[in-house]
Amino acid sequence: MKSLCYLNQEDCFPAAHKALTDPNGLIAIGGDLQPERLLSAYQQGIFPWFNQGEPILWWTPDPRAVFQLSDYRPSRSLMKTLKRQTWRFTINKAFDAVIHQCAALRQEGTWITPAIKAAYGQLHAQGDAHSIEVWQGEQLVGGLYGIAVGKIFCGESMFHLETDASKAAFHLLVTHLRRFEFTLIDAQVMNPHLARLGAKPLPREAFLTQLAQLKHQHSPATAWQPQEVKLGY
């Protein structure tokens, strides 16, 4: 029988095969959200996910929800929306506002707690966490954020205040990642919304194999400089 690992401040994460099957992928509890631990977790295919008032819970589910960038195809309806809309798009221009909106739209029971906001804000400040923003004039109407681990982007959350704005942010993300030769987006846990966007389940072992190959392949600094971008069709 597998037992749950309780982390102290300096403990390392256990191997992925020691994760529980019920609940799927729970591998450890406790520890902290310091940047060093978070980056170590993502480099091992582990991420934090817990509600306000709970201890820190760490997960590595099997299977993993992923987007293979070579397989991504935007829907016709999204492309029509993009040609019709007057949105503008930026990268890393409003990280704090994006994560705030991602938390606000979930209201009660959000897992984007003040501790998560602070931790990922630190990762952003040191160049590891990134945001995509969609604007209508000067109003932020959609976006997403996540962590770059080598040539894998680990998506965390997205939001929209206008129809399809989060899908537009995702489309921009894919376009940008392809430009810099990323091959995979980690979406963590399958759900119907991700499936509609094109996510597929990937066995954990296969995901970890890809992660091991891609996590040391770094992008140029220009990839994540704050910038306004044009969305090609």
UniProtKB/Swiss-Prot annotation:
The organism's place on the tree of life at top rank: Bacteria
Role, per record: Functions in the N-end rule pathway of protein degradation where it conjugates Leu, Phe and, less efficiently, Met from aminoacyl-tRNAs to the N-termini of proteins containing an N-terminal arginine or lysine.
Reaction it catalyzes: N-terminal L-lysyl-[protein] + L-leucyl-tRNA(Leu) = N-terminal L-leucyl-L-lysyl-[protein] + tRNA(Leu) + H(+); N-terminal L-arginyl-[protein] + L-leucyl-tRNA(Leu) = N-terminal L-leucyl-L-arginyl-[protein] + tRNA(Leu) + H(+); L-phenylalanyl-tRNA(Phe) + an N-terminal L-alpha-aminoacyl-[protein] = an N-terminal L-phenylalanyl-L-alpha-aminoacyl-[protein] + tRNA(Phe)
Keyword set includes Glycoprotein: no
UniProt-annotated location(s): Cytoplasm
GO BP field: protein catabolic process
Originating species: Shewanella denitrificans (strain OS217 / ATCC BAA-1090 / DSM 15013)
MF terms in GO: leucyl-tRNA--protein transferase activity
Pfam families per the UniProt record, alphabetical: Leu_Phe_trans
Enzyme class, spelled out: transferase
EC numbers on record: 2.3.2.6
Main location: cytoplasm
Keyword Flavoprotein part of the UniProt annotation: no
Family: Belongs to the L/F-transferase family.
Protein name: Leucyl/phenylalanyl-tRNA--protein transferase
This protein's GO CC annotations: cytoplasm
Keywords: Acyltransferase, Cytoplasm, Transferase
Family annotation (SUPFAM superfamilies): Acyl-CoA N-acyltransferases (Nat)
